[in-house]
């Protein structure tokens, strides 16, 4: 390797593992290193992480990527960070030690605080300012919980001795050895404390939750130099940290969804659908979240987001729970050999229903079984349930935004399933564009970092770098498509009726 060649490093800090990926100028992955870290479950429904273990895992993968590639720290032009969103850390400003475990986005331990806010009638005020629904999912209730449960924390926070941050903030603080306390628009927008219209921390919400402003990081754009790594923490390199975005927003950017009306879906454990709505903020009237997609070059692009709780994990359930398949990839072949007429519906509401239903009491159900139903039919119906849920969200997005969606850009593990992608195109009646490079989250962070230091000249230059790998076009006729979808809506309705209290 010539020492002249320069690269961008993306740090992708996820819910179960941390990764460091090195990209070249063509947006190709040169090296990557991954390390899992422990999940902590103090009680049912609670999920926590040790923030120091997260930091250790990040240091370890940075080293791993250097070792695998023989690239030196000095060859890294810039670092981009992308992270699991909403997960909350509160630490001591002097010692740098967290005062409690990080409370993870999925954790329900703060649900009573969220319920109280709803009962007190704050739903509309919080929705109008933050674009979010009141839920334990977002950081606000998590900060309040830590301040309530750690002795003396409230008083220390008021004195300015404690700092709060989502994972992006924590990593920048550690990489710069405590010199920089910042977050970006996309992460701030998920705290339920940030006014996304006025682009500032919201005094009314902070007062309501009694969260001292002194704890909060400064909010910056998604593409600018926030600070440099301390050589001690980056194996001798002083490298600008110059791009940052929450994981789903980074994927939106990595999918090059720069124009209003462009939509991406990441098929992970759950499924996250984000639509760029441009520079106008559009409050959802139908239970989608309004959030910030990204802010770059002085302009903020807003977005609508719908989350589906169960997508890829429905395939894992077929494998681990029902043992119908040995590997996830086997689901495609089995579904392909099903001869049924798609009359079986699986509603995988294992943890309730996400957008646009938000029904936490619903549980999974199956409809349309006959004596002739086979394992193949069941596997196919489970795959189709992912596509039906995506249509629920896409239809809602079209209503909220008034924009006709022409194409869905896809990435994530289950996007490799051709049968699912074809059925997705059919049930939506639009084209599905699968990215050539499915590492869109890390790539998005790398793009944001590289743009800000001139490694890439412009967003136009990026458009050449992640072309569509494969296009799936709708082939199903309209009447069949609508008949199938009507059956799905009936199945969901019946599932909700079954979950109602007697």
Swiss-Prot record:
Glycerol binds at residues 85-86, 137, 247-248. One of its GO terms (molecular function) is glycerol kinase activity. ADP binds at residues 15, 19, 269, 312, 413, 417. Keywords: ATP-binding, Glycerol metabolism, Kinase, Nucleotide-binding, Phosphoprotein, Transferase. Activated by phosphorylation and inhibited by fructose 1,6-bisphosphate (FBP). It catalyses: glycerol + ATP = sn-glycerol 3-phosphate + ADP + H(+). The modification Phosphohistidine is found at residue 233. Pfam families: FGGY_C, FGGY_N. The phosphoenolpyruvate-dependent sugar phosphotransferase system (PTS), including enzyme I, and histidine-containing protein (HPr) are required for the phosphorylation, which leads to the activation of the enzyme. Its EC number is 2.7.1.30. Pathway: Polyol metabolism; glycerol degradation via glycerol kinase pathway; sn-glycerol 3-phosphate from glycerol: step 1/1. One of its GO terms (biological process) is glycerol-3-phosphate metabolic process. HAMAP family: Glycerol_kin. Homotetramer and homodimer (in equilibrium). Key enzyme in the regulation of glycerol uptake and metabolism. Catalyzes the phosphorylation of glycerol to yield sn-glycerol 3-phosphate. Belongs to the FGGY kinase family. This is Glycerol kinase. It comes from Streptococcus agalactiae serotype V (strain ATCC BAA-611 / 2603 V/R). The lineage of its organism: Bacteria, Bacillati, Bacillota, Bacilli, Lactobacillales.
């Amino acid at each position: 390797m010539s020492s002249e060649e320069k690269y961008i490093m993306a740090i992708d800090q996820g819910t179960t593992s941390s990764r460091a990926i090195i990209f070249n100028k063509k947006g190709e992955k040169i090296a990557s290193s991954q390390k899992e870290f422990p999940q902590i479950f103090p009680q049912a429904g609670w999920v926590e992480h040790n923030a120091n273990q997260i930091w250790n895992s990040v240091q370890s993968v940075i080293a791993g990527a250097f070792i695998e590639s023989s690239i030196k720290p000095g060859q890294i032009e810039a670092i981009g960070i992308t992270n699991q969103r909403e997960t909350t850390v509160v630490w001591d400003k002097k010692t740098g030690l967290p005062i409690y475990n990080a409370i993870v986005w999925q954790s329900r331990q703060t649900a009573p605080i969220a319920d109280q806010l709803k009962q007190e009638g704050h739903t509309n005020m919080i929705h109008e300012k933050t674009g979010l629904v009141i839920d334990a999912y977002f950081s606000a209730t998590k900060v309040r919980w830590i301040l309530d449960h750690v002795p003396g924390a409230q008083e220390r926070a008021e004195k300015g001795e404690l700092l709060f941050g989502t994972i992006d903030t924590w990593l920048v603080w550690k990489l710069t050895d405590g010199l920089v306390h910042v977050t970006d628009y996309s992460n701030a927008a998920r705290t339920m404390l940030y006014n996304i219209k006025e682009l500032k921390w919201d005094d009314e919400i902070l007062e309501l939750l009694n969260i001292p402003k002194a704890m909060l990081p400064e909010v910056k754009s998604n593409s600018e130099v926030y600070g440099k790594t301390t050589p001690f923490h980056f194996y001798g390199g002083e490298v600008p940290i110059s791009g940052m975005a929450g994981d789903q927003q980074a994927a939106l950017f990595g999918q090059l969804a720069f124009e209003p009306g462009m939509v991406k879906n990441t098929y992970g454990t759950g499924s996250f659908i984000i639509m760029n709505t441009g520079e106008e903020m559009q409050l959802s009237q139908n239970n989608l979240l309004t959030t910030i997609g990204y802010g770059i070059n002085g302009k903020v692009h807003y977005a609508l987001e719908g989350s589906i709780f169960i997508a890829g994990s429905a395939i894992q359930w077929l494998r681990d729970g029902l043992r119908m398949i040995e590997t996830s990839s086997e689901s495609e072949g089995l579904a392909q050999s099903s001869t049924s007429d798609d009359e079986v519906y699986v509603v995988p509401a294992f943890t309730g229903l996400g957008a646009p239903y938000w029904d936490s009491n619903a549980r999974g159900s199956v409809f349309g079984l006959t004596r002739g139903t086979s394992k193949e039919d069941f596997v196919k119906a489970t795959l189709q349930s992912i596509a039906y849920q995506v249509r629920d969200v896409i239809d809602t997005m079209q209503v909220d935004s008034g924009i006709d969606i022409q194409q869905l850009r896809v990435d994530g593990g289950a996007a490799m399933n051709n049968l699912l992608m074809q059925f997705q195109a059919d049930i939506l009646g639009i084209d599905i564009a699968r990215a050539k490079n499915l590492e869109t989250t890390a790539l998005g962070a790398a793009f944001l970092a590289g743009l800000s230091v001139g490694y890439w000249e412009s967003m136009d230059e990026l458009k050449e770098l992640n072309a569509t790998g494969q296009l799936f076009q709708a082939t199903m006729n309209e009447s069949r498509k609508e008949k199938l979808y009507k059956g799905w809506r009936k199945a969901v309705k019946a599932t909700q009726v079954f979950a109602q209290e007697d």
